[in-house]
Curated annotation (Swiss-Prot):
Enzymatic reactions: adenosine(1518)/adenosine(1519) in 16S rRNA + 4 S-adenosyl-L-methionine = N(6)-dimethyladenosine(1518)/N(6)-dimethyladenosine(1519) in 16S rRNA + 4 S-adenosyl-L-homocysteine + 4 H(+)
Stated family: Belongs to the class I-like SAM-binding methyltransferase superfamily. rRNA adenine N(6)-methyltransferase family. RsmA subfamily.
Predominant location: cytoplasm
Keywords: Cytoplasm, Methyltransferase, RNA-binding, rRNA processing, S-adenosyl-L-methionine, Transferase
Binding site for S-adenosyl-L-methionine: 18, 20, 45, 66, 91, 113
InterPro entries: KsgA/Erm, rRNA_Ade_diMease-like_C, rRNA_Ade_Mease_Trfase_CS, rRNA_Ade_methylase_Trfase_N, rRNA_adenine_dimethylase, SAM-dependent_MTases_sf
Taxonomic lineage: Bacteria, Pseudomonadati, Pseudomonadota, Gammaproteobacteria, Enterobacterales
Annotated PANTHER family: DIMETHYLADENOSINE TRANSFERASE, DIMETHYLADENOSINE TRANSFERASE-RELATED
EC numbers on record: 2.1.1.182
Subcellular location: Cytoplasm
Species of provenance: Photorhabdus laumondii subsp. laumondii (strain DSM 15139 / CIP 105565 / TT01) (Photorhabdus luminescens subsp. laumondii)
Gene responsible for this protein: rsmA
Enzyme class (EC, first level): transferase
Keyword Cell membrane: no
Name the record gives this protein: Ribosomal RNA small subunit methyltransferase A
Amino acid sequence: MNNRVHQGHFARKRFGQNFLTDQFVIDSIAAAINPQPGQAVLEIGPGLGALTEPVGERMDKMTVVELDRDLAARLQVHPQLKDKLTIIQQDAMTVNFGELSQQRGKPLRVFGNLPYNISTPLMFHLFSYTDAIADMHFMLQKEVVNRLVAGPGSKTFGRLSVMAQYYCQVIPVLEVPPTAFTPAPKVDSAVVRLVPHKSIPHPVKNIRMLSRITTQAFNQRRKTIRNSLGDLFTVEQLTELGIDPSTRAENISVEQYCKMANWLSEQPEMQS
């Protein structure tokens, strides 16, 4: 039997499809999400409905974003869900989550078993809508969850860690083995909860500046900051900001990155 076929659907590699089939894991995730009637619940990549069903049975209505036309068509005729679902057949990377929140008149509760091939860019897309999101629960590669929760000094601390923690409180929920999926992925998975900060702890004036600094620093993570960010800061400027010029990117805190971004935003040559 072809292990890429589940419930008559052939898992498409280009969409990174791995279908969740372990009922204990499914129930545990639904319990962690704890959806309540009247909330604006949205699922990204519902697939064959493994999570849609236990969440949907508690809701009067919910929204799903599904790129695969065959899976979207199956959901349209799902006996228990079809009257509850608003189906958006679209790439989640192009969805305006702010508009969806406005339409519902409340912040979104977003969840999904995210395709591993788009999970990181999709997280960055969602971070730009955190003012329209109440919380997010995602199944991701365990390695990605480790990066999301990592702190300074960890080898897994990187740009994703900084940007995620700038916007959200990041809470690991559950580890999931490959055997919970069909077809089984080659990596371990984990569920993470991201709760946007009600008030950003270390606000930056220009988020693009924070993105630029973290990209540049972590792209050259083996170098000291005086070298990787040498075109942006002098040794004296870094010292004045309370940052050791001889340290590396992974040893600088989120607060310190925000301090650097704000200082850079104030420089006349950066105003254009």
